């Protein structure tokens, strides 16, 4: 078994333009994320970080190269690859009339987690959402919604957690709570990947850092 949680080999993505030149968002990118580490993917806005994450999430189809998640090729074993990763997207999107509890239960159901194995209450508690568990999502603050995104990513207890710009627009207190939780997960063996353009944040949290710029 590979000692890499994520392996990227010569990954590329080109977006075809309508009447304009194609845009190459990823250009022959290769790197590996060792299991059990906190790994930072650092780069400015538009560098290609979110494109790479969206390929891992199955939301974007790569143009070339290979990607493995926990040893599973995303093309050959897409279901196993997807079950091995939890992704916290940069955008905060929720059905405004779902409660946090309902959102987590629905997400667990989508992953086929049996009811007796679900960890909904534990996630709500760990992310300081217990008192809002039955409130409509539209009533939550931005910080609470971001914490709920983290909880949704962990409903199936994946060995890898990916956070795409998780502290964008988040106050300092909430940022600290989030990192305390992430460090706790990492101590329990979860591999963590975060994208950020904050060098100081990456240096404080990460075991190692890769820099991506202009898709490379």
What are these regions (language model features)?
Residues 105, 109-132:
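Conserved ABC ATPase "signature" region
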Residues 2-6, 14-28, 35, 78:
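A short, flexible loop at the N-terminus of ABC-type nucleotide-binding domains that lies
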Residues 161-164:
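Catalytic Walker B motif of ABC-type/P-loop ATPase nucleotide-binding domains
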Residues 157:
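Conserved catalytic motifs of ABC-family nucleotide-binding domains
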Residues 136-140:
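Conserved ABC ATPase signature
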Residues 44-48:
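Walker A (P-loop) phosphate-binding loop of ABC-type ATPase nucleotide-binding domains
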């Amino acid at each position: 078994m590979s000692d890499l949680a994520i392996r990227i080999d010569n990954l590329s993505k080109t977006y075809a333009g309508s009447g304009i030149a194609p845009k190459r968002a990823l250009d022959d990118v290769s790197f590996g994320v060792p299991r059990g580490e906190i790994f930072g993917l650092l780069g400015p806005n538009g560098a290609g970080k979110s494109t790479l994450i969206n390929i891992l999430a199955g939301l974007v189809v790569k143009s070339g190269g290979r990607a493995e998640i926990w040893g599973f090729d995303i093309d050959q074993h897409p279901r196993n690859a997807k079950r091995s990763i939890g992704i916290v997207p940069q955008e905060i999107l929720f059905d405004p009339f779902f409660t946090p509890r309902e959102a987590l239960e629905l997400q667990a159901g989508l992953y086929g987690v049996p009811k007796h194995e679900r960890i909904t209450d534990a996630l709500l508690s760990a992310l300081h959402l217990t008192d809002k568990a039955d409130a409509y999502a539209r009533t939550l603050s931005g910080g609470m919604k971001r914490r709920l995104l983290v909880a949704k990513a962990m409903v199936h207890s994946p060995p890898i957690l990916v956070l795409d710009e998780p502290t964008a627009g988040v106050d300092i207190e909430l940022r600290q709570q989030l990192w305390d939780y992430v460090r706790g997960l990492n101590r329990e063996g979860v591999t963590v990947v975060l994208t950020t353009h904050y060098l100081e944040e990456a240096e404080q949290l990460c075991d190692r850092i890769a820099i991506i710029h202009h898709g490379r």
